[in-house]
């Protein structure tokens, strides 16, 4: 598949105005994401075309990070967990040795599994996960805990890989003939018999159309009514500080590219596990669009709304 993801650091350009050309055309509507610490990100708002942006470095601005989108560095998850009193544990080592962290939040007989970064570059899902966890801590779901795995492709995350369409297959096509340690660990947790839901958090394609929105990928005809109910409750739970969401952008099974029959993805594999009431993918845009522009704060707020929608839709 096409490789649209990029990130780099510029040193020693203080006082200069520089134009960056990213062929063949992978610059978002609002320019590059810009950071000085890999934690706080803003848009440059200087896209000159679909393939370029400019940046004027301040007189003392000697070290700047630029990226396709607002990255979510693993250190942010650890800092978030520390501030919230969450113990981060070691799930396993990835295939190249990178530790894969996870956290169990709350207590209860039932388990909600949150996964992100099956595709290494899809950082928006981690902001959503952070918001879900934050909302849960304020208002737990009775007798239900959360197992959060923020970096399934941990090797790819630390290497700066895009991760999608790896060969022989990527992490979200690994649930039958499993070769990745992180996926193997998810399958083990999901098979423990106590899982209520598996919520897999992704980012879509680079840009345009539905990719500028937030949308759910529904994957089960049998659970279609439950997933549509969740969508309505999620939409009703959206607050002014969150990204906009409408069920009209969701995609049903058998529509457009959502036609996979094999259970190779996380949500399609987990939907058939006995006891699992909901398993689906949430796709969260990298950029948004005018009037609905992605920011770190808005993504986290959207995660809070997501959990509220889940809570309000749960008939189980």
Which residues fall in each region the model found?
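Hydrophobic beta-strand residues in large extracellular and virion-surface proteins
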Residues: 8, 18-20, 32, 146, ...
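Residues that cap or initiate secondary-structure elements
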Residues: 14-16, 26, 59-61, 72, ...
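Extended acidic/polar, glycine-enriched regions
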Residues: 47-97, 106-107
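Short helix/loop capping segments that flank catalytic or ligand/cofactor-binding pockets
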Residues: 74-77, 122-124, 290-291
